[in-house]
Amino acid sequence: MIPVEALTPFEARIEHAELVETIARWDEAYHAKDAPEVPDDVYDGAKRRLARIEGRFPELAAKSPIRDKVGAAPSEGFGKLVHAVPMLSLDNAFAPEDVAEFDAKVRRFLGLGDEAPLAYVAEPKIDGLSINLRYEGGRFVSAATRGDGAEGEDVTRNLETFPATQLPRTLGPDAPAVIEIRGEVYMTKADFLALNQRQEAAGEKLFANPRNAAAGSLRQLDPKVTASRPLSLFAYAMGEASAPPAASHWEYLERLKAWGFVVNPLIRRCDGVAGLLSAYESLGEARATLAYDIDGIVYKVDDIELQRRLGFVSRSPRWAIAHKFPAEQATTLLEAIDIQVGRTGALTPVARLTPVNVGGVVVSNATLHNEDEIARKDVRIGDTVIVQRAGDVIPQIVGVVPGKPRGAVPFVYPETCPVCGAHAVRPEGEVIRRCTGGLTCEAQAKERLKHFVSRNAFDIEGLGEKNIEFLWEKGWVRGPADIFRLKARNDAELLQRLENFEGWGKRSTEKLFESIKTRSAMGLERFIFALGIRQIGEATAKRLARHYGSFGAWRAAMLAGTEEARAELTSIEDIGPSVAGDLLDFFSEEHNVQAVDDLVAAMAALDGAVEDAKVIESSASPVAGKAVVFTGTLVTMTRPEAKARAEALGAKVVGSVSKKTDYVVVGADAGSKAAEAVKLGIATLSEQEWLALTGAAD
C-alpha cells in the first residue's frame, strides 16, 4: 500500500472514496446486523487511514458520509428511544505519539501549559455492546442500545432479565432525580465457548466471537432468549443527569459501585502521558489472562467540569480517546478475485478467501484496493496470502507466501464492466477504473436505488435489497420516482398484482405502501443524501440543507450557473472545489434534473413534499442559524472553545467575513476581519457582549 505521505491528489481522492464506501458497508454489518465483516482493528485501521488522508488533503473531509456517523439506525424490530445526551464513539490512538498529541490537544483547548497538572482515568475497552440505562426517582425505567447515537433500540424488557447484582433496580437516596448510566454488555470467553457448544449440539448457528454473541443475545425480540444467555455488564459512563453526581469521573465510578453496579477493577487514575502509557503497557501484558475480550484502553479527562468545557467534535468527545492494541496476521488461500461495481461505477476487486481465524474473528473477504496493488504484490488466484488485522491500514492482503502454485497466472483486470459490458476507463493519474455505463448499467442503477431506500436515506420499511432486486427484475421500479408510483401501478394491474407473488401477501404489500406514503414527506438533508451524488455523504448533505434551508433554494442555487453561486457553495464548511464540482456536474445533466423533479412530483402526488431543514434551536438561542466570525485574542475562552460553544447554540462559525456574516466577535489585537466587518456594516461584538448575547456572561 502506498504511504499516505506519498499519495498524489488523484490517488488520495480515489482511495478516499473507496474507504468511505467500504467503511459504510462495514458499519451497517456491524451495528445493524450484528455480523461484522472484519475485525475491529481492521476497521479501526481503515478509519485511521481515512483520517490521515483527510488530514493531508482537507478538501476530502466533506466526502465522508461516515465522518459524523455513529453506529447504525435502530432495528425496526424494536421500539426506539431517543438519547437525551448522544451516545458517541471515540477517536482512536495507535501509538505513544498519538496519546501525546491527544494530551497536547486537550491542553491547548483548555489553555493549560505542559507542566500544569491534568488527571486522567484509564479504563479497559470492553469488546461488547454499549447500553444506556435510565433511572428516574432512583428507579430503573428503560434501557436502550447505542443505535445511531441519537436514538437506540428499546431493550428494557431484555435488561430486566439481568440479575440485580448486574443491574440494580433501585439506586440509593443520593441519586439524582434523573440519571442515565452507560456501560457495556459483554460475554466472557468461557461463557462464549459454552454457548457455542450448546448451539452446535442443537444444530444452530455458531457465533463468530464473544462480542457478536453478546450483541445477538441482547438484541432478541423474545426476552426469554436473552435470559437464557450468559451476559454480564460493566458500568463506566454517564448520560443525562438532572444534577451532577460527582465532581470527577473517578468519584462517579465510586458512586456507581455504591449503587450496586459492577465497575471494572482494572480502572486506574493516571497523571499525564507517562501515566497513561504505563497503564496501557500493564493492561497489554494482562490482556491474554483476562476472562473477557478487550481491544484497547480508554483514557478520559477526570475532571467533569473540564469534560464539559472540552465538549464534543463531530462524532466524539474531545476529552476521551481509545488507545487500541496492535494488529494480528494469518495465512490462508486466495480462492477467487471478484470485481464489484458500486453506485458511482467504481470497479473494486475483492479477495474471496478460505475462511481463517485472525485473532478470534473469522475472515473470508479482504479488499485488494485496485489493479495497481494487485500487480505490485503479484497476487494470483491460488496463492497463499497473508491477511492482516492492522492498526494503521485498510483491511488487506499484506503479502503473498513465496512459492506460487503451478499454473497460477497474473490476474488480468477487466477493461469492460462485468455487469453491463460498457467500457471501464481509468483516467490518467487515477487508480480506480470506472464503468462508463452510468444509469444504463444495471449494477449502478440498482445500487443507487438500494442507497435511496437505505436506513440513513429514505429508510422505506419493507423495501430492502431483496425486494429492490425483485421490483427491478419485474421492471416496476427503475428510478426513485417509480417507488412512489408503485401503489398506483399495482392498483392498475389486473393479473400481476404484487400481493399475488410468493413472499409478498396482502398485509406485507399494504404495509409497504403505507411506509412509502409515510416517506413521501422527507427532510431536505435526507433527500439530498438519498440522491447518491458522488462525494455527498450524510454530513455534507446536512450542511447543504442547513445552509440553503429549502429544496427550492437548494435547487435554484445548483442550477444558477454563476460564479457567485459557486462561491457561496464553496463557502460552506468542508465543501471545497472538488465536492462543489461534483454537485454542479450532477445538476448540469438534464436527465438528472428531470429525475429529481420527477421524484418531487411523485412525492407530491402522495401528499408529500421535501420538508425544509430544521433550524437548530438550542434553548431558543438568539444565535441559532447565524453566521459568526471570531477574530483576535479571547480572554475567557480559547478559540476552539468559543467555536464549540457557538456551534452548540446552533450558530455557524465561519472563517471569513462576507455579506452573509451576521456577527463578528472582536477580541484583543483583532486584524483585518474587524475592519472588513465595519466596512460591510456587519454587527461587531466584544467578547463580553457575545457572552451576554448567548447567556454565558457571569
UniProtKB/Swiss-Prot annotation:
Its cofactor is Mg(2+); Mn(2+). It catalyses: NAD(+) + (deoxyribonucleotide)n-3'-hydroxyl + 5'-phospho-(deoxyribonucleotide)m = (deoxyribonucleotide)n+m + AMP + beta-nicotinamide D-nucleotide. Belongs to the NAD-dependent DNA ligase family. LigA subfamily. This is DNA ligase. It comes from Paramagnetospirillum magneticum (strain ATCC 700264 / AMB-1). Signal peptide: none annotated. Keywords: DNA damage, DNA repair, DNA replication, Ligase, Magnesium, Manganese, Metal-binding, NAD, Zinc. The active site is at residue 125. DNA ligase that catalyzes the formation of phosphodiester linkages between 5'-phosphoryl and 3'-hydroxyl groups in double-stranded DNA using NAD as a coenzyme and as the energy source for the reaction. It is essential for DNA replication and repair of damaged DNA. The gene is ligA. One of its GO terms (biological process) is DNA repair. SUPFAM superfamilies: BRCT domain, DNA ligase/mRNA capping enzyme, catalytic domain, Nucleic acid-binding proteins, RuvA domain 2-like. Disulfide bonds: none annotated. One of its GO terms (molecular function) is DNA binding. Zn(2+) binds at residues 417, 420, 435, 441. Its EC number is 6.5.1.2. Transmembrane segments: none annotated.
